[in-house]
Amino acid sequence: DGVVTGFGKIEGRPVYVYSQDRAVLAGSVGSAHAEKIAYVIQTARKLGVPVIGLNDSAGARIQEGLSVTSAIGKIFFENSIASGCIPQISAIMGPCIGVGSYSPALTDFIIQVQNTSQMFITGPAVIKEVLGKTVTMEELGGAKIHSEVSGVTDLVAKNDEECLGTIRKLVGFLPSSFESLPPRKENSDDPARALDKLETIVPEDMKRAYNILQVIKTIVDDGEFFELKAKFARNLV
């Protein structure tokens, strides 16, 4: 019904996944489609594992009538119940309209593919009709607008392959649920090491500005720092 669901492992850790198929009715969300997504989120929560959504949807399949609105409500309910219990990660990999944007916005992390994905409530044609303004899909909900202006998007990927790689990396930083600890791995940095480089980064004059990112990358293990919302609210890290 336009969505493939299942489970697997990332670096040996179990995850649940659902992936919308634009080749089937433009990835629109019908009753069965919504029920499958809601069930996957619910199951992931009960098992205490992350859930990942690969989103590419034209929105609600309104020709199904009121039954679809009830089923879609179950997705939002499960998103809300799972919040704070398990990591919920959304990849926006194509145009996501209406309900295709609502559910990802309720999740913890959003990764958007540059140039090929958009998130908006209603499209350019409706904006033109109602407001008399002409906007493109990118201007309305592209990766740039959401990563730099609205702040909805946490990470931007250049293509689908990079998006999936980013998800793998992100999962590696997160606990499987609120009941577990984040994963640990061996590194080459000595916890008691001296960081002489900090003396060249932080100025003696407290009124002078300096790049806090350089400080963070010097302190963290192996210089590995995974930043979210890098281009939104640039005064914050």
Report the location of each language-model feature.
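Non-catalytic terminal/interface segments that mediate subunit docking, oligomerization
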Residues: 1-11, 16, 45, 204-237
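Long, structured ligand/cofactor-binding scaffold of large enzymes
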Residues: 1-89
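Gly-rich Lys/Arg/Thr-decorated short loops/hinges at beta-loop-alpha junctions or inter-strand turns
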Residues: 16-25, 54-58, 85, 128, ...
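Amphipathic alpha-helical transducer elements in NTP-driven molecular machines
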Residues: 34-38, 103, 164, 213
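Generic, well-ordered alpha-helical scaffold segments in large soluble proteins
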Residues: 40-43, 78, 166, 170-173, ...
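Conserved catalytic cores of soluble enzyme domains
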Residues: 55-179
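Terminal amphipathic helices with adjacent charged low-complexity linkers/tails
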Residues: 155-213
